[in-house]
Regions:
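Positively charged, small/polar-rich N-terminal and surface patches that mediate targeting and assembly
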Residues: 1-101
Length: 101
């Protein structure tokens, strides 16, 4: 199993919708059983600029993390689909153990 996480800006869009929504829809269409989007309350990126949830941050500068737990085949299919759209999306793919106790 893999944890596939995408780190995007809340202002990023694709196909006339927020990118986090598009990622969730595309994963669902491939048969991924679930996914979640999480909005950051604060952070900084590669340029070192601090972003926080304040009145002045209403321009959509905060990060959104979209993640899925899926097998290798689905992870590869989702990544390939995203590559086919020539997007600039940072991701992490980690091997994880998942279960229910």
């Amino acid at each position: 199993m893999n944890l596939l996480s995408f780190y995007i800006s809340e202002k990023q869009h694709h196909a006339d919708m927020p990118l986090y929504e598009w990622l969730l829809e595309e994963a669902k269409s491939l048969g991924v059983h679930g996914g979640s989007a999480f909005r950051a309350i604060a952070g900084f990126g590669r340029h070192g600029h601090m972003h926080e949830e304040t009145f002045f941050e209403l321009a959509g500068e905060l990060a959104v993390k979209v993640e899925f737990i899926l097998d290798d085949a689905l992870a590869d299919r989702l990544l390939e689909k995203i590559r086919g759209h020539n997007m600039n999306v940072f991701y992490l793919k980690q091997t994880v153990e998942a279960g229910v106790v």
